[in-house]
Curated annotation (Swiss-Prot):
CDD domains: Obg (cd01898). Keywords: Cytoplasm, GTP-binding, Hydrolase, Magnesium, Metal-binding, Nucleotide-binding. InterPro entries: G_OBG, GTP-bd, GTP-bd_Obg/CgtA, GTP1-OBG_CS, GTP1_OBG_dom, GTP1_OBG_dom_sf, OBG_GTPase, P-loop_NTPase. The lineage of its organism: Bacteria, Pseudomonadati, Acidobacteriota, Terriglobia, Bryobacterales. Its cofactor is Mg(2+). Belongs to the TRAFAC class OBG-HflX-like GTPase superfamily. OBG GTPase family. GO terms for molecular function: GTP binding; GTPase activity; magnesium ion binding. This is GTPase Obg. GO terms for biological process: ribosome biogenesis. Gene3D superfamilies: GTP1/OBG domain, P-loop containing nucleotide triphosphate hydrolases. It comes from Solibacter usitatus (strain Ellin6076).
């Protein structure tokens, strides 16, 4: 888990101005005041959406402004209200007022709504200022300004996809290839000493979070290697991507590596090993023995697990893998009616 944080500006619509007008009718040379009121400004509402996974979209669009109300008109006509806007945020987003530090709202359930900036009231037209002794008032009010706030949005990110596999199976290299994360990468075990998380951006501002879980070794469920604490990080992921080095450089058997990791997951938690999983053969650019790849493919097929071949160095298979992950963890985008 890590904290994603963005700062945004929200501005509700100003109210429309009240109108200064008088009745103009035939045979009524001195008609009374008829200025209508200004319309109310639109609100800015934050809406908790299951279709939002991260705060990435706010980095591209940090300002959100509702429409101002229309001005009042003669004949006591009130101006139209400004259009309000809804701004989607992910479940788990906490909203703070940047100026005061006050915690304004904590979104926990899809569909929750919070009006974060209210539109300004429309100004009164001159019809409201007439009295028995003041029958031709020229007073009229400007609209009230809509609320404007600078907000800090904070999201505790849980990974949608957990990358598991032996040390140096290529997890850190893959996450650096498909996201903006820059984990430490080197050719020795336990380069990754804590989970790295990266946000993977897809088309249409959709995104999901991938966690590069530190290398699991035999005995991890008992605390060996980097221990049990890192297995806990993948308990709440929606998909496991099991990376297996199929090159000869490792000096290891890909099938045996796969089986050992599966045993460690099962010993830690039955629910963990039952999670949706895909199998990813890594380092295909330096894999010289096709039999090693085929053996792993056959094993994945026997367990009814999708199988992918990639090279993070050359980009082979990366796009197909990204889309396969997205298809499994992102909710379908609703089609407008």
């Amino acid at each position: 888990m890590f904290i994603d944080e963005v700062r945004i500006l929200v501005k509700a619509g100003d109210g429309g101005n009240g109108c200064l007008a008088f009745r103009r009718e035939k045979f009524v040379p001195r008609g009374g005041p008829s200025g209508g009121d200004g319309g109310r400004g639109g609100d800015v509402t934050l809406v908790c959406s299951e279709h939002a996974n991260t705060l990435l979209q706010f980095r591209f669009n940090p300002e959100h402004k509702a429409e101002r109300g229309r001005h009042g008109e003669g004949s006591q006509r009130t101006g139209a209200e400004g259009r309000s806007i809804d701004v989607a945020v992910p479940v788990g987003t906490v909203v703070y007022d940047e100026a005061t530090g006050e915690r304004l709202y904590d979104f926990t359930v899809p569909g929750e709504r919070f009006v974060v900036a209210r539109g300004g009231r429309g100004g009164r037209g001159n019809q409201h200022f007439a009295t028995p002794t003041h029958q031709a008032p020229t007073e009229h009010e400007p609209g009230r300004p809509g609320e404007e706030k600078r907000l800090r949005l904070e999201l505790k990110l849980l990974a949608d996809v957990g990358l598991v596999g032996f040390p140096n199976a290529g997890k850190s290299t893959l996450i650096s290839r498909i996201s903006a994360a820059k984990p430490k990468i080197a050719a020795y075990p336990f380069t990754t000493l804590e989970p790295n998380l990266g946000v993977v951006q897809m088309e249409g501002f959709r995104s999901f979070v991938v966690a590069d879980i530190p290398g699991i070794i035999e005995g991890a469920h008992e605390g060996h290697g980097l221990g049990i604490q890192f297995l806990r990080h993948i308990e709440r992921t929606r998909l496991l991507a099991h990376l297996v080095d199929v090159s000869e450089e490792s000096g290891r058997d890909p099938v045996q590596d796969f089986e050992i990791i599966m045993q460690e997951l099962a010993r830690f938690s039955d629910q963990l090993v039952a999670k949706p999983m895909i199998v990813v053969a890594t380092k295909m650019d330096v894999a010289q023995d096709p039999a090693r790849v085929e053996a792993l493919r056959d094993l994945a097929k026997s367990r009814d697990l999708p199988f992918f071949e990639i090279s993070s160095a050359t980009g082979q298979g990366i796009d197909a893998l990204k889309h396969a992950m997205a298809d499994r963890v992102l909710a379908p985008v609703p089609v407008p009616e």
